[in-house]
UniProtKB/Swiss-Prot annotation:
It catalyses: di-trans,octa-cis-undecaprenyl diphospho-N-acetyl-alpha-D-muramoyl-L-alanyl-D-glutamyl-meso-2,6-diaminopimeloyl-D-alanyl-D-alanine + UDP-N-acetyl-alpha-D-glucosamine = di-trans,octa-cis-undecaprenyl diphospho-[N-acetyl-alpha-D-glucosaminyl-(1->4)]-N-acetyl-alpha-D-muramoyl-L-alanyl-D-glutamyl-meso-2,6-diaminopimeloyl-D-alanyl-D-alanine + UDP + H(+). Cell wall formation. Catalyzes the transfer of a GlcNAc subunit on undecaprenyl-pyrophosphoryl-MurNAc-pentapeptide (lipid intermediate I) to form undecaprenyl-pyrophosphoryl-MurNAc-(pentapeptide)GlcNAc (lipid intermediate II). Pathway: Cell wall biogenesis; peptidoglycan biosynthesis. This is UDP-N-acetylglucosamine--N-acetylmuramyl-(pentapeptide) pyrophosphoryl-undecaprenol N-acetylglucosamine transferase 3. HAMAP family: MurG (MF_00033). The keyword Cell membrane applies. Its EC number is 2.4.1.227. CDD domains: GT28_MurG. Its main location: membrane. GO terms for biological process: carbohydrate metabolic process; cell division; cell wall organization; lipid glycosylation; peptidoglycan biosynthetic process; regulation of cell shape. It is found in: Cell membrane. It comes from Bacillus thuringiensis (strain Al Hakam).
Amino acid sequence: MKKIVFTGGGSAGHVTPNLAIIPYLKEDNWDISYIGSHQGIEKTIIEKEDIPYYSIASGKLRRYFDLKNIKDPFLVMKGVMDAYVRIRKLKPDVIFSKGGFVSVPVVIGGWLNRVPVLLHESDMTPGLANKIALRFASKIFVTFEEAAKHLPKEKVIYTGSPVREEVLKGNREKALAFLGFSRKKPVITIMGGSLGAKKINETVREALPELLRKYQIVHLCGKGNLDDSLQNKEGYRQFEYVHGELPDILAITDFVISRAGSNAIFEFLTLQKPMLLIPLSKFASRGDQILNAESFERQGYASVLYEEDVTVNSLIKHVEELSHNNEAYNTALKKYNGKEAIQTIIHHISEA
């Protein structure tokens, strides 16, 4: 039986692509383990999947000054030792890393044990963890073809993003019943990320009188961002977040308004949903969402509205543009084959 160790954490985006790959390896009888941090979100997610989980010390990799930067290099070194010992005991055939600060000690620990390491990078440019890990890896899978120019050519394999199988199995009838919607108007699903997005939430709600004339709205507004005055608004349903219902909601969705995190937008792409992307500004991120959104716009998958340009009028104008050019967007979206990503990655895992 072949063995694999997965790693990646710090945010859900460094875990969910692993979840898309794991079921296929289970079918092929791989022995699967996961190494992550003691208290990261990856621990909560993976333990629900009935996969052996091993914790190591980890320090965050920061690009800015913080007093914790004095302590964290020692935590990283401790993490490398923890990972080295754990990997020596597990004896995996390959390590697959999705990035995030916890992955660096695992990648180095694998390299010290002479275990082949494969990386996956979701964004257009590599994050700090993958930049460090790359020198210890044999291959790096990229989600965007344009990402190759930022990486060593001999290590890059373009795959696209692995998408969880359950996302593709939504039921429209269940969504209609859950939301209380009709078939008479198209549905827009609005997602501002797990914490919501204040400006998006406020602008959407200001635009509701105009939007609800033509559309039904599902608004995933983030924790603590519900508006009680809108709870019974016809054609408008708001949730802090949804879990098992999301595939059904996406099945009934005609257009998506969203941030431009890579994992989410590739799910929309695989589902062939035209998108209005409002990326995080450079003031709130390293600018990766802007690059992601602009790539999708160039390929005809999405329209981009920059956060500093978000107003009621600009939002309505972009939604109308999506609707008016729906056929052109759908033609472009149909050219993408999302299922190839998982098969390509599994092939290289098996060959490692």
